[in-house]
Amino acid sequence: MEGTSDKTLLLFDFDGTIVDGDIAHTLLGTTLTKEELKYVMDTGEMNYAQSMDRYCKLMSSKGKTMNDLHPILESVKFNDGIEELFNFIRENKSKYYVILITGDDLYITSYYLKYKKWYDIFDYFIGIPAFIDEKNDKQLLTIQFLPPHTCDFCDKSLCKTNEFLKFLDKNKEYKSSQIFYICDGWNDYCLSKNYLKESDFIAARKGFSFWKLMQKEEYNKNIKSQVLYWDKGQEIIDFIKKNSKV
């Protein structure tokens, strides 16, 4: 993938940032009984891949396909102003690289963005690999497990810092890009603390996990970048316009 440093890199989280809530939790909460939900989620630790693997096998045993579940994914709402932000990016795409980095599996996030007709503004997707295996009729989705990590801020399935560094190692042309990280959660703090520089910017959703961490000096002191706390997409547009080098 080609790229040059004359573009700004817009890095997006998904759950709580692009969409209101958690798309996988919406899927599970809509389709499972309390007993089934406990079974799927009781992995002993935060482990998205293991939970989704259990979920897919359970739903397959009921004869369900992804076509049965697509309407639930389609019903998830964007956060206020996110589509306006996406439209701004589309109109100015020559200035920006756009990457999604999520702890979700990439099937449900990609499906959602394709259905909402915003998939094309993204240049790259970082997340848990997942696909429909037509040869395996006993599995709804095939979830691929990434190597284990020891990060305390990320779900055990995926460390955002680890995966972003892997991406940069294969796509070195992105290393010199100024970054705007649009996010909200604990695992976003991980990447912000470990990689983002003084020349980068963070747009963290007001009132959510990242914001709560930043109210404490022990966490705040580790962030080098300037941080905006946002409620609506227009605030992010204004933040990018004011601070982007391009």
Where does each model-flagged region fall?
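Short boundary motifs at domain starts and secondary-structure transition points
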Residues: 1-3, 171-172
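Alpha-helical substrate-recognition element adjacent to the catalytic core
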Residues: 2-129
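C-terminal cap/substrate-recognition subdomain and adjoining C-terminal extension
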Residues: 9, 80-99, 104-246
